[in-house]
Amino acid sequence: MKKSRGLSDYLWAWTLILSTLSGRSYGQPSQDELKDNTTVFTRILDRLLDGYDNRLRPGLGERVTEVKTDIFVTSFGPVSDHDMEYTIDVFFRQSWKDERLKFKGPMTVLRLNNLMASKIWTPDTFFHNGKKSVAHNMTMPNKLLRITEDGTLLYTMRLTVRAECPMHLEDFPMDAHACPLKFGSYAYTRAEVVYEWTREPARSVVVAEDGSRLNQYDLLGQTVDSGIVQSSTGEYVVMTTHFHLKRKIGYFVIQTYLPCIMTVILSQVSFWLNRESVPARTVFGVTTVLTMTTLSISARNSLPKVAYATAMDWFIAVCYAFVFSALIEFATVNYFTKRGYAWDGKSVVPEKPKKVKDPLIKKNNTYAPTATSYTPNLARGDPGLATIAKSATIEPKEVKPETKPPEPKKTFNSVSKIDRLSRIAFPLLFGIFNLVYWATYLNREPQLKAPTPHQ
């Protein structure tokens, strides 16, 4: 029956065309000829839709409907780290074969718009990881439909999709991601509808040369894949495209890394100030600690609240530890300075001089010599004894204290051994940390994790 109907359509169309050609002259087609062509294709479309049921898929009960797809990306981006999503603008193409739409006519391809698409069966394709999808309708629905004479259809539409992009931020901001775009049939299992890529994997998804709309990422490329997803209603074919992104580090070097490095260097300037400069060293320590706190808070604002530490978090934490250690170092030096002992073993408190004993002893507000003489009484009795008494009288002598070699006085510009050690140890350790940090993360291969789709 299908063959007879197709043959009658073919003969009828050619009869009309030959009848119009019999009276035409060579040159531009007349208005009557154009009107006749319009009538021919109108009749063809009417006959195609006569008895057509768009509720039934092609090959129902006979075969599996194969839908071939490919994607042309006109715009990719932006990518939101906070919401873990990206936006993509595509021309989404689907092709399948419907024997009910075979025709014979003067043209091998019927080029139609969206009005015809609503009257025939089309795949119920949806995006598994799409948060919001928009079909453009200005000024008319951006849809294209082409029907070839053997019943093969090409259905193209322009879509803007906002899709999920699971991100693993352990290496942030030296991280890389594979953002998936997953689509498939919503109602038909793989026993009814299967999806295939139209071309080889390298050409099935193409990004326009000027299609990147990314400020913080580089689009490295894309890969395609397909798989089967098991759900409670059956097994479904899922087509997946991964867009591989690598983050640009320049913004974060300027906004976070350089300020952190400069803050650590500034905190180490206090080691070169003398230990008696308490106000200056206190200002250095407190200011740098507060600066690091502000930098750590601002660096986290642009990221989602993840439960693990990122590479930037580790860098900020180590810088914070260096700054805080510099403040503790000054507190330690100041503590020993106040106690009067420097770490070089010299006393800061000067030694008090010893008192010289006075040979006179004060008694009852009068001074008396330590050796009492009774010369006047003896002189009255015997002049000889008086002479002996005078000679026996001990005259007091001044006792001089023992002299010790003077110790070198402590100057106000003295340097503690802790400061001397810190001037070398802190910059050396911070330089080693930076060398290990940047060598580790910059040479690490991107870990692109693509979770298995599910429904």
Curated annotation (Swiss-Prot):
Disulfide links within the chain: 165-179
UniProt superkingdom: Eukaryota
Gene Ontology molecular function: GABA-A receptor activity; GABA-gated chloride ion channel activity; transmitter-gated monoatomic ion channel activity involved in regulation of postsynaptic membrane potential
Post-translational modification: Glycosylated.
Stretches that traverse the bilayer: 253-273, 279-300, 311-332, 421-440
Binding site for 4-aminobutanoate: 93, 156
Subcellular localization: Postsynaptic cell membrane; Cell membrane; Cytoplasmic vesicle membrane
Membrane topology value: Multi-pass membrane protein
GO biological process: chloride transmembrane transport; gamma-aminobutyric acid signaling pathway; inhibitory synapse assembly; synaptic transmission, GABAergic
Pfam families: Neur_chan_LBD, Neur_chan_memb
Regulation: Allosterically activated by benzodiazepines, the neuroanesthetic alphaxalone and pentobarbital. Inhibited by the antagonist bicuculline. Potentiated by histamine.
GO CC annotation terms, alphabetical: chloride channel complex; cytoplasmic vesicle membrane; dendritic spine; GABA-A receptor complex; GABA-ergic synapse; plasma membrane; postsynaptic specialization membrane
Function: Alpha subunit of the heteropentameric ligand-gated chloride channel gated by Gamma-aminobutyric acid (GABA), a major inhibitory neurotransmitter in the brain. GABA-gated chloride channels, also named GABA(A) receptors (GABAAR), consist of five subunits arranged around a central pore and contain GABA active binding site(s) located at the alpha and beta subunit interface(s). When activated by GABA, GABAARs selectively allow the flow of chloride anions across the cell membrane down their electrochemical gradient. Alpha-1/GABRA1-containing GABAARs are largely synaptic.
Domain-related comment: The extracellular domain contributes to synaptic contact formation. The GABA-binding pockets are located at the interface between neighboring alpha and beta subunits.
Family: Belongs to the ligand-gated ion channel (TC 1.A.9) family. Gamma-aminobutyric acid receptor (TC 1.A.9.5) subfamily. GABRA1 sub-subfamily.
Record's protein name: Gamma-aminobutyric acid receptor subunit alpha-1
